[in-house]
Amino acid sequence: MIGWSAVSRSLRLTASIASVSLLFAGIGCAPRAGSLSGAVTPARFPVTDIPRGHQRIVFRWEYVDQALAAKGEGIARVASPDSVRLDFYLDGGLGGGYAIVVGDSISTPGGDQVRRYLPPVALLWAVMGRLAVPATPDTVAKVDGDVLRADIGRNPVWRVTFVADHLTRLERIVSGRRLEWVSRTGSDVRYQNERSSRSLTLKITSTDEAPPFDPEIWRR
């Protein structure tokens, strides 16, 4: 999913095919989002800030779309309050790549050809368990037991789900249809783009505190 050199030509071909497909398919391919369930409640969200200091998260990953499948190992180096570098390594030593997220910006060596394969920043932060979508005056929240759901904004709508104060799901909804989403269940994280049938799954194997990272890792 990130700009590893070994598959860059495949990514460009996939992007061309996907752009033509989307021209005809459009938003209609995505499933309807439906309405929120539960009882109306004030829109007060749990705190999801990145833990103070630095973390090193190791994971297995697998990426699949209509023309490409790849898997390997990865490392996320996280620095509070709002910075993460994601490194992806293909199995078999076939290459690798990275993406840097600082606040609401993404940088990757693959440029626009690769960036189109990345989720929006808000969904990338949801992968890390952080809600990066500010509440708006028209936010609607509902509660059902220990599950809190809320719709934030209008077209796109960001639908967030918390279970016992933990962010477990974030969806991007446009014109009433769920275009893409991230879900978190224990050590498993999944990103799905409904229009282009793209998915990225992560299996977190370890999370450890780390000393401050070399400033060079944030150089773009």
Where are these regions (language model features)?
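Sec-dependent bacterial lipoprotein signal peptides
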Residues: M1-C29
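N-terminal leader/targeting segments and the immediate start of mature chains
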Residues: G28-S80, G111, L118, P211-R220
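N-terminal beta-strand/beta-hairpin edge segment
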Residues: R60-D65, A70-I106
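Residue-level recognition of conserved beta-strand positions in structured domain cores
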Residues: F88-L90, G110, R172, N193
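Short, surface-exposed beta-strand-loop junctions and turns on beta-sheet-rich folds
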Residues: D91-G95, Q113-R116, N155-W158, G176
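A short, polar/proline- and glycine-enriched secondary-structure boundary/capping micro-motif
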Residues: G95-G103, L118-V121, L179-V182, L200-K203
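Acidic/charged, solvent-exposed loop-and-adjacent secondary-structure segments enriched in E/D, K/R, S/T
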Residues: I106-P137
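Gly/Pro-enriched, hydrophobic low-complexity segments
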Residues: A141-R220
